[in-house]
């Protein structure tokens, strides 16, 4: 899986960078978590700071376009993002599991 950054736009008010990217893959569309981890590695960020919002693969193509938001810290992501986006990206899931266990 190859990731190419198509564009970045800083949003200092929300302490994040909006990123548009393209993925070239050999098999099926990669999972949101594998894209998040690969994108975080490419941007030299922690995977908890990256929230993948959209993955769009055209029928029969081995290319996927997507959008992600890269925050300055996981706390900023948890404060700004909707709960369902945090669940999809498995951000803060370990904390919630620990609270439920107690």
Swiss-Prot record:
Disordered: annotated segments: 70-102
> GO BP, one example?
translation
Cross-referenced Pfam families: Ribosomal_S24e
GO cellular component labels: ribonucleoprotein complex; ribosome
Q: Which GO terms describe its molecular function?
A: structural constituent of ribosome
Composition bias (Basic and acidic residues) maps to: 79-93
Please provide the record's keywords in A-Z order.
Ribonucleoprotein, Ribosomal protein
The record's section on InterPro entries has: Nucleotide-bd_a/b_plait_sf, Ribosomal_eS24, Ribosomal_eS24_CS, Ribosomal_uL23/eL15/eS24_sf
- State the Gene3D superfamilies in the record: 3.30.70.330
Q: Which family does it belong to?
A: Belongs to the eukaryotic ribosomal protein eS24 family.
**PANTHER family, per the entry:** 40S RIBOSOMAL PROTEIN S24 (PTHR10496)
The name under which this protein is listed is: Small ribosomal subunit protein eS24
Q: Which organism is it from?
A: Halobacterium salinarum (strain ATCC 700922 / JCM 11081 / NRC-1)
């Amino acid at each position: 899986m190859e990731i190419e950054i198509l564009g970045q736009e800083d949003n200092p008010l929300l302490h994040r960078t909006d990123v548009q990217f393209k993925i070239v893959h050999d098999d099926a569309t990669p999972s949101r978590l594998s894209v998040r981890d690969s994108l975080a590695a490419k941007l030299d960020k922690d995977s908890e700071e990256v929230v993948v919002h959209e993955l769009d693969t055209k029928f029969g193509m081995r290319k996927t376009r997507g959008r992600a938001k890269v925050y300055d810290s996981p706390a900023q992501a948890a404060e700004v993002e909707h709960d369902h986006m945090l669940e999809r990206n498995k951000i803060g899931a370990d904390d919630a599991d620990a609270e439920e266990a107690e």
